[in-house]
């Protein structure tokens, strides 16, 4: 973003050689961000992701207790963790439901997976609107017919998607 502010306007009357000359004289210190947002090496990944999203930055310097730079965390690092958390690299079937917030719903759904011979690889809930949630989970070794027959009796669940991954 800072580089965009330093770039010449497309409406400039300078020729390409003058532009290159001016840019060659420009120093990093003249365009760098001075108020840098950082995280500590002991902070959670969730905190780092939140800071990045709220501040619209793709990377954050990571500091140790003494305030020394020890690394950098990037969007790519966050995506890698997200992929692992979602079980993307593991074979199974993913179901996504829209539902209301009901105590015991996750327990009931987990029991149906268990009773259908399955094992949950990943499970996530996402609030959407009006007290409703999206539930997305991935399971392996699932007797799909048995699972779908049992889950169809749960009126509060609306199937949004089913994907073999």
Regions found by a protein language model. Give the residues of each.
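Conserved functional loop/turn residues at catalytic and ligand-binding sites
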Residues: 2, 27, 35, 56, ...
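Charged, alpha-helix-enriched surfaces in structured cytosolic catalytic cores
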Residues: 26, 73, 104, 108
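A glycine-centered beta-loop-beta connector
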Residues: 1-7, 52, 60-76
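The conserved cystathionine-beta-synthase
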Residues: 38-56, 63, 82, 106-116
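Bateman/CBS regulatory modules and CBS-like beta-alpha motifs in cytosolic regions of diverse proteins
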Residues: 18-50, 62-63, 69, 94-102, ...
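A short, polar/charged loop-to-alpha-helix boundary motif
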Residues: 2-22, 77-91
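A conserved regulatory-domain signal marking ACT and ACT-like small-molecule sensing domains
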Residues: 82-165
């Amino acid at each position: 973003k800072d580089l965009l502010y330093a770039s010449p306007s497309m409406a400039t009357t300078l020729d390409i050689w003058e532009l290159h000359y001016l840019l060659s004289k420009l120093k990093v210190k003249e365009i760098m961000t001075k108020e840098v947002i950082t995280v500590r090496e002991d902070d959670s990944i969730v905190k780092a992701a939140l800071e990045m999203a709220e501040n619209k930055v793709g990377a954050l310097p990571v500091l140790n207790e003494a305030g020394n730079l020890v690394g950098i965390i990037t969007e790519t690092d966050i995506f890698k963790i997200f992929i692992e958390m979602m079980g993307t690299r593991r074979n199974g079937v993913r179901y996504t439901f829209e539902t209301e917030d009901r105590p015991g719903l996750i327990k009931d759904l987990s029991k149906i997976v268990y009773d259908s011979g399955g094992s949950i690889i990943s499970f996530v809930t996402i609030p959407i609107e009006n007290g409703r949630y999206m539930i997305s989970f991935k399971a392996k070794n699932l007797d799909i017919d048995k699972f779908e027959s049992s889950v169809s009796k749960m009126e509060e669940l609306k199937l949004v998607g089913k994907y073999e991954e």
